[in-house]
UniProtKB/Swiss-Prot annotation:
Enzyme class at the top of the EC tree: transferase
Name of the protein: Glycosyltransferase family 92 protein At1g27200
Residues in GT92 domain copies: 293-540
UniProt key word Transmembrane helix: yes
Organism: Arabidopsis thaliana
EC number: 2.4.1.-
Transmembrane segments: 22-44
Record keywords, A-Z: Glycosyltransferase, Membrane, Transferase, Transmembrane, Transmembrane helix
Pfam families: Glyco_transf_92
GO MF entry, a single one: glycosyltransferase activity
Subcellular location, record wording: Membrane
Lineage: Eukaryota, Viridiplantae, Streptophyta, Embryophyta, Tracheophyta
Amino acid sequence: MTEYENGKKRKVRNKQQVKVQFLSQRYLILCFCCFFVLLFFLSSDRISTLSVRSDSLRPSLRVPTLSVLSSSMDSFHRGRFPPLSVEDRVQFPDHLLLILSHGIGKGEKNLVCVYRGVKEETLVLPSISSDEFDEFRSIVRCPNAPLNYSSSVDLQFRGDLVKKKMKKQSRRVHNWEKVGYEAVIDGDTVVVFVKGLTRRPHKESDPSYYKCQFEIENSEEKEVTQAIAAAQEVVRCGLPESLKLNPEMMFRVSVIHIDPRGRTTPALPSVARIYGSDSIEKKEKKSGVKHELCVCTMLWNQAPFLREWIMYHSWLGVERWFIYDNNSDDGIQEEIELLSSENYNVSRHVWPWIKTQEAGFSHCAVRAKEECNWVGFFDVDEFYYFPTHRSQGLPSKNALKSLVSNYTSWDLVGEIRTDCHSYGPSGLTSVPSQGVTVGYTCRQANPERHKSIIRPELLTSSLLNEVHHFQLKEGVGHMSLVESVAVVNHYKYQVWDTFKAKFYRRVATYVVDWQENQNQGSKDRAPGLGTEAIEPPDWKRRFCEVWDTGLKDLVMSNFADQVTGYLPWQRQQQE
């Protein structure tokens, strides 16, 4: 064989070796790509056999397969969040509330609830929702435990391997009917909100029957102080010295009840926490200039109506907004963030406690006291209107702020009450595109009930309220406005698709839910409706006795664009 032929064969062999090496590299790259694609599908919940879909509430047994991939997902989640640690669980009638000892943010969709049966079998269901709770904690809502499964629910990320035995941590489940649920520092006292102490509505209780217990987290140390005031679901006690001296500490606060015979019962279970740093922050706020007029409200799924309400009342002079969100799932956080970006001073406070409107208002009165001279308590479907300003050609802008400012120096006036006019559907069958103030123009003839704007520092220490008004300190009274000066337009009976949501649950503590066959003559109910959300044939014509376009005319003349006619809250149409 010639040297030329030998050289040619060597070149062919070299080419084959290079080709084999190239194919091996391509094969390895292809394998890695397949691995990461599979990992993506697992994390995106694309393979139903490995995870549970978030839009399904059907039980699904968890099969612990592909442990290598699960370990990878574990590492991924550990990089994003600290280990999930369930601090407390509260059993509500229609869901379980899990309180986490750290933050995970609102709307985390990759969380699943893990249930364990009597034989240690596991069941995985998607979480209902998640949210921020306070500065340090988060909450997750889970479906109620199915039959034969424990309510001591655990929490994991979707795609993680279900552990047969969880790390040792609190397994307690609190009954919503008997638990301390919130606490807030007010000066040298703490206000504790608790279910299960008394069912006496609208009356103060003897504080000598109550004490507050303060327990330092992760410690056996406990301190007890005597109650100063008590009413409904509120107990106020003095702060212990240890909290004043340790502002960096966190305390669990619970309430002890002493019966009339002097026997002390164990402290009620509690998920309420306070932080020593809260008292320092409040002292710093107290030194600043207060807003003249603020508003507190509690709502559920009112995001579509919030913009009109805030823009209009801001024009009347409201400077600060406290929104207590009672389990909304309609994008309320995004709406508030948008309003804040437009320089409206709005904050959202997560309030997961059902049927506690009175307590929520008391809580807000304490929070707002350091920032506001006056605080209004009214709903998103209620709008202040000044008929005299309209009829006499007086400017209505800042009218509400000017009104309360006239009484700021009056130490004997702690509350300003305004009567309400209830409006009906006004012949409409769909939500008015220009908002409630323009769309609903027919009302009942006679006013019913009232709404209040209060001076927080002139309330009784018990913070007793009946939603529509608060109890004031001895010697302090209220001012009732005549209708010609101011009224509240209450768009109470809207088109049926909006109105029927009221059947879901009433927010006030002592108001019976409409599905229950009780107190059907109550003013809280709609006359002529039973216990089911069935639309009457003549609904659009009901509650219409007087056509009143006063507020509509005011809004159109002051808010409508002169060229397009659009109102500023018609954002979607303008886009």
